[in-house]
């Protein structure tokens, strides 16, 4: 196992290497829709790309999730076929959110540098497709 300091250092190195290797401005938190954000996730067990719905008003969360869910067929057929819709995703801190995500299929651990390149390639291949879907359907999603 790694000490807390080693763990922190490896995480920082992972994200720094990603940013330097693939300098690009991602949408991420800049969706311009309150409570809706894209995220790259990497931890000791897996990596994924997420669209998280975490508005302070649960009714808004449900509406946003339902609107994106109504576009599920388009998202799967035209952008990212492996997408998973979860209306009650439990985060590590036990918070329940609505999450739409794509898992990295290869074995991955943020603590194993040999798995990093595969994850980076997954991120740069899949996130642009996910973002493109969002940007093309943003007006429908944001119609609250």
Q: Language model features by range: what are they?
A:
Residues 1-144:
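Charged, terminal alpha-helix-loop-beta segments
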């Amino acid at each position: 196992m790694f000490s807390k300091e080693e763990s922190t250092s490896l995480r920082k190195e992972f994200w720094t290497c990603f940013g330097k290797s693939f300098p690009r401005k991602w949408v991420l938190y800049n969706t311009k829709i309150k409570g809706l954000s894209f995220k790259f996730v990497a931890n000791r067990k897996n990596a994924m790309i997420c669209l998280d719905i975490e508005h302070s008003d649960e009714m808004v969360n449900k509406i946003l999730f339902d609107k994106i869910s109504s576009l599920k067929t388009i998202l799967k057929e035209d952008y990212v076929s492996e997408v998973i819709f979860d209306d009650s995703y439990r985060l590590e801190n036990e918070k329940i959110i609505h999450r739409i995500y794509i898992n990295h299929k290869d074995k991955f651990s943020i603590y194993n540098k040999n798995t990093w390149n595969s994850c980076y390639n997954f991120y740069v291949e899949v996130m642009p497709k996910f973002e493109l879907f969002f940007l093309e359907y943003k007006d429908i999603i944001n119609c609250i």
